[in-house]
Design a protein with these regions (language model features):
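Eukaryotic intrinsically disordered, low-complexity regulatory regions enriched for S/T, P, E, and Q
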Residues: 678-702
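Heptad-repeat coiled-coil/leucine-zipper oligomerization helices
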Residues: 630, 637, 644, 651, ...
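Conserved acidic
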Residues: 10-641, 645-647
Length: 702
């Protein structure tokens, strides 16, 4: 089943005025006349207040679902588009407050409601889920790809919908909602058909796309006997997760003209296909002093020195504000061995301290990625956009499953006994009463000490996610480190000169495609840029609550005065109050500007911002006592080697001076003899003394 709700603002709180439900069966056509609808103003004869009528809309929707479940004698899944952050919040509160006979089991992590299961006793009757978790994207775009025959998504003037004109606008409002429900039904039906046809997998058996991708990988491409994926314990996960930094986003030059914007074709899938992966069971090494870095493969805590001569440093580092920067200086961090080796080749000093070592193994993902990428190309060539879309999202979703963090925020709706237990025995964030004997509680999971409390998500293997992202940074660095690189964001670069033809292709995995030719562009901060493409198109991106207040002129003004800030009004139309489970509209004032110097330091020429320099740091605070002793010992070794090197250099210099003096003396004697002895034999008259290097001098036996 698929469903939708429509809301109106009453005292800045969203209240449902309409709801609809459509039964979708495999192989059967769907029509809008099959949609059950519930409209608040239809109850105006029996209910005076809108609050009561709004409650009745959801009450009858739930009642209809319960009736279908009893008639069909089957458990049903009902999908909403954006259930996690909108419809699901409305339903969770409604069920907790108005359906006391039901037991609710919400699956909520990090303030995202993935599933809301409804029980009668111990029997699950139905469950609500978010279609976005399986099919990410706007409903209009999904429908265009998967079910174009059902027509386009409609629109309504939300700002014109008021309590006073709800009744008069009934037809247009219900038509809009019914079209959304019809499109969602078509999208889910087509997706279910495709996945069943290709893989014999029912999408209803998985909540998220990454889980679905993992299931298909395991079923069709994975050989567990030859490549068992190790699930880390708490100590392993906590250590290796420090090496899971993600993508690299930075702005280097704030303004440029006549530029080239490139994207890599499926960067992470390419890395998963071509690069080795950490396999086997990790082995802990508490002291790697004196060990050869080249012989290691795994995740290492290392003491690192990046010279100030490196303009665009390679190794990431999280500062005290949890900002990911790429600094010069002296610091300690946990890194994938391959990026430490790469950094050393760039001129970094790398001293391994401790870490988990794995087996270096060929990637288990090669067949999975190759098959999906080739199938996607074939689908695009044949014009089958629906299949091409499915192959693309599957290929790009597997990696994220391995990086799921076991430490998360869990939200429960529970009775008073459970509420009191969580207050006493969990790392509580908040707890509030929703209704009699119904409480909402949020707490942190997997934060207790001891292995008995460790309950990570199934198939969480952070070593794979960390290796993939680190290898991607290695792959991108030759392009990022170019002098003409203006901006980078994980799998893209903006360059002043074109890339060579041999690395360009729109259809080869891992090669670059020209996304845009940029006439002029402003790159003021990570994920905050504006450029005019060569065809005149304006492309603008800004990350932050005030993004609707940002225009091309703002980028021009901000570039002229980077420190400029202004207070702007911002409407947050769908803010969730987790204490009350209300979705509210909130108007706030936000200071709009860019944060200078948090990732790189701006460089000015005659008061014009022209470039950036890396931040220089010194931070050894993460070292424990053993680590400090190891670093002290390694530093002493380095100092000793430097001293020995200086002594040898001085000896070499002394020998070279002696050779030079000896050469000068011999030449002087020879010249004097030549001038005084006119009867020199012919053989000697051709003799020349040539200068010699110290090494030649030693070889000659002087």
């Amino acid at each position: 089943m698929v469903a939708d709700t429509e809301t109106i603002l009453i005292d800045n709180v969203h209240k449902p005025y309409a709801a609809g439900l459509l039964m979708v069966r495999p192989g059967e056509q769907i029509y809008d006349i099959m949609i059950d609808t519930y409209f608040s103003e239809d109850y105006s004869i029996i209910l005076d207040s809108f609050e009561e009528r709004s409650t009745k809309v959801l009450y009858d929707l739930v009642l209809r679902i319960s009736t279908i479940v009893r008639q069909e004698q089957s458990t049903f899944t009902i999908y909403f588009h954006n259930f996690s952050r909108f419809d699901g919040i409305l339903l969770l509160k409604h069920l907790a407050c108005h359906h006391k006979s039901y037991k609710l089991k919400p699956l909520m992590r990090n303030h995202r409601l993935y599933e809301l299961a409804v029980y009668s006793g111990k029997k699950m009757l139905f469950r609500f889920r978010d279609s976005l978790n399986l099919l990410p994207g706007k409903l209009s775009a999904l429908a265009k790809n998967l079910c174009p025959g059902l027509g386009p998504k409609g629109s309504i003037p939300y700002e014109e919908v008021t309590l006073s004109n709800l009744a008069s606008m009934k037809k247009s409002l219900l038509d809009y909602m019914k079209q959304d429900i019809l499109l969602l039904g078509g999208v889910m039906k087509k997706a279910q058909e495709i996945y069943w046809k290709l893989y014999k997998v029912d999408i209803e058996s998985h909540i998220t796309l990454s889980s679905l991708a993992l299931s298909i990988f395991r079923m069709k491409y994975y050989d567990a006997s030859n490549w068992p994926i190790h699930i880390p314990n708490k100590n392993e996960d906590s250590f290796i997760r420090r090496a899971y930094y993600g993508g690299h986003t930075d702005t280097y030059k704030p303004y440029g003209e006549d530029l080239y914007y490139y994207d890599v074709n499926s960067l992470y899938p390419f890395i998963m296909k071509e690069f080795p992966m950490p396999g086997g069971v990790p082995v802990w090494h508490g002291n790697l002093e004196g060990k050869n870095l080249d012989s290691m493969f795994g995740f290492i805590e290392a003491y690192v020195v990046c010279p100030k001569t490196i303009k665009k440093p390679f190794l990431p580092y999280r500062d005290k504000n949890n900002t990911l920067i790429f600094p010069t200086g002296e610091f300690v961090g946990v890194y994938y061995c391959e990026e430490l080796k790469y950094a050393r080749g760039l001129g970094y000093t790398v001293l391994p301290i401790s870490g988990y070592l794995f087996e270096r193994m060929e990637s288990p993902f090669s067949d999975f990625v190759s098959s999906l990428f080739e199938s996607r190309l074939e689908a695009r060539i044949s014009g089958n956009e629906a299949m091409a879309y499915v192959y693309k999202i599957l290929m790009n979703s597997l990696y994220g499953r391995f990086g799921i963090n076991p430490k998360s925020t869990i939200t429960e709706v529970c009775d008073e006994d459970r509420y009191k237990h969580l207050i006493r025995h969990s790392e509580l964030i908040f707890g509030d009463m929703l209704s009699e004997n119904n409480y909402i509680v949020a707490y942190h999971s997997n934060t207790e000490t001891g292995s008995d409390y460790w309950n990570p998500p199934k198939n969480s293997a952070v070593q794979l996610a960390a290796a993939i992202t680190a290898s991607a940074r290695i792959y991108m660095y030759p392009y990022i480190s170019r002098e003409d690189c203006y901006y980078t964001d994980t799998d893209s670069v903006v360059l002043g000169q074109p890339l060579p033809k041999e690395v360009i292709s729109s259809s080869v995995l891992g090669k670059f495609k020209l996304e845009d030719r940029v006439m002029k562009g402003y790159f003021l901060a990570p994920k905050s840029y504006f450029y005019i493409a060569i065809d005149g198109t304006n492309v603008l991106k800004y990350k932050g609550p005030a993004k609707n207040q940002v225009y091309p002129e703002w980028f021009e003004s901000q570039y002229a005065d980077p420190s400029r800030t202004e207070l702007v009004p911002v409407e947050a139309n769908f803010r969730i109050d987790w204490h009350t489970l209300n979705i509210i509209k909130k108007d706030t004032l936000v200071r709009l500007g860019i944060k200078l110097g948090t990732k790189r330091i701006p460089v000015y020429h005659r008061d014009v911002w022209v470039d950036t320099d890396p931040i220089d740091i010194k931070d050894l605070s993460s070292l424990d006592h053993i680590g400090k002793q190891i670093i002290k010992s390694l530093r002493n070794d380095v100092i000793l080697l430097q001293t020995e090197n200086n002594i040898l250099n001085e000896k070499f210099s002394q020998k070279e001076r002696e050779i030079a003096e000896r050469y000068k003396e011999m030449k002087s004697q020879f010249d004097a003899k030549k001038n005084t002895d006119k009867s020199t034999p012919p053989l000697l008259s051709t003799f020349r003394v040539k200068p010699m290097s110290f090494s030649s001098y030693m070889l000659e036996g002087y």
